[in-house]
C-alpha cells in the first residue's frame, strides 16, 4: 500500500509523501481542500492536446568542408612540432583539468576510475566508472557512463554530428572494458530559437535523424534525454548541439584505465570504419570493432 511504502522510505531516512493513487476508473481527478478541482478522462489526456505541425528544411552540406577531413586554419602553415603544440591549445583539445577539479569525484567512496589516471594524474579517462551502492557487503558491479560530441562537426552537419556523437560515446565505453552492445543512451540537445523558420527547424530534425540512424545501426536505443530550443541571444546562436551519453554496466575488476601500464607499451589505432560515400560510420563493422576481445 501507499502508506506502507512511505513507512519503508522513512526507515531508510528518505522523505516521502503520497501525491497520487492509481485506480482503474480511467479518469484523472485532483482535489484541493476537499473540493474536486480537476476531473478529466484519460482518453482525452492520451490525445496529448492539439497536433502541432512545422515546416522543415534540411539544407545539404558542403562535402569539401567536412570538418573530419580538414586541417584547422590555425595549423595549416605550421611544422608538425609547432602544429602539435598549437593543436593542444585549441578549445576542442586543450586540458579540462581545471574544470574537472571543481567537482568531487570521490563522494560515496564508490569511484573506480578517478578523472585523471597515471602517476601524476595527467591522463584523462574516457568514462566515469563507479560501483553501485549496496547496503551490506561488497560488490564488483559498476556503472559506466561516457559522452560524445564534436562541436565543429556539429556546425558542418547536425546529422553527421549526432551519428558520430553516438559512436564516440559507445567507443569510450569499449575503451574502459564495458560492453557497448548492452548500453543505453540519453541525449542532451541544445539548439537556437526556432521561431517559424524552416531552415532552423531543419537543424534539430537533422540531428535527431542522425541519432536515430546510429541507434538503429548499433541496435542501441536512447531511453531518455533533455532538450532546449532557446539557445539564442540577439544575433548570437548556439551551434546545433546533440550530446550523446552512453550508460552501461560492467565489472569494476575488469575496468581498463587510460594510462600506460609499463615501459615500451604498444599503441595501436583502431579506426572507426567510415563509408566514403556518406561520410557516416559503417555500423555493422563498428559493432564488431567495439565488441571484439
Describe these PLM feature segments.
Residues 1-292:
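Glycine/proline-enriched, intrinsically flexible loops and inter-domain linkers
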Amino acid at each position: 500500500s501507499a502508506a506502507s511504502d512511505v513507512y519503508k522510505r522513512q526507515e531508510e531516512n528518505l522523505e516521502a509523501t503520497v501525491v497520487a493513487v492509481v485506480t482503474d476508473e480511467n479518469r484523472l481527478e485532483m482535489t484541493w481542500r476537499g473540493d474536486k478541482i480537476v476531473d478529466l478522462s484519460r482518453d482525452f489526456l492520451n490525445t496529448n492536446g492539439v497536433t502541432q505541425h512545422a515546416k522543415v528544411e534540411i539544407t545539404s552540406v558542403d562535402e569539401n568542408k567536412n570538418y573530419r577531413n580538414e586541417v584547422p586554419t590555425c595549423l595549416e602553415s605550421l611544422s608538425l612540432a609547432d602544429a602539435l603544440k598549437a593543436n593542444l591549445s585549441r578549445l576542442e583539445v586543450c586540458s579540462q583539468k581545471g574544470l574537472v577539479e571543481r567537482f568531487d569525484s570521490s563522494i560515496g567512496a564508490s569511484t573506480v576510475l578517478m578523472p585523471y589516471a597515471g602517476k601524476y594524474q595527467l591522463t584523462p579517462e574516457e568514462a566515469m566508472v563507479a560501483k553501485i551502492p549496496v547496503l551490506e557487503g561488497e560488490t564488483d558491479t559498476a556503472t559506466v557512463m561516457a559522452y560524445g560530441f564534436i562541436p565543429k562537426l556539429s556546425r558542418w552537419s547536425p546529422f553527421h554530428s549526432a551519428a558520430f556523437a553516438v559512436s564516440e560515446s559507445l567507443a569510450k565505453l569499449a575503451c574502459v572494458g564495458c560492453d557497448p552492445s548492452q548500453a543505453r543512451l540519453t541525449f542532451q540537445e541544445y539548439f537556437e530559437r526556432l521561431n517559424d523558420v524552416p531552415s532552423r527547424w531543419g537543424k534539430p530534425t537533422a540531428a535527431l535523424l542522425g541519432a536515430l540512424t546510429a541507434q538503429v545501426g548499433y541496435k542501441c536505443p536512447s531511453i531518455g534525454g533533455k532538450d532546449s530550443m532557446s539557445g539564442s541571444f540577439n544575433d548570437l546562436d548556439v551551434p546545433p548541439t546533440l550530446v550523446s551519453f552512453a550508460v552501461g554496466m560492467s565489472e569494476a575488476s575488469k575496468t581498463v584505465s587510460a594510462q600506460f601500464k609499463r615501459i615500451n607499451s604498444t599503441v595501436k589505432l583502431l579506426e572507426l570504419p567510415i563509408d566514403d560515400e556518406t561520410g557516416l560510420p559503417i555500423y555493422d563493422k563498428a559493432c564488431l570493432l567495439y565488441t571484439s576481445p
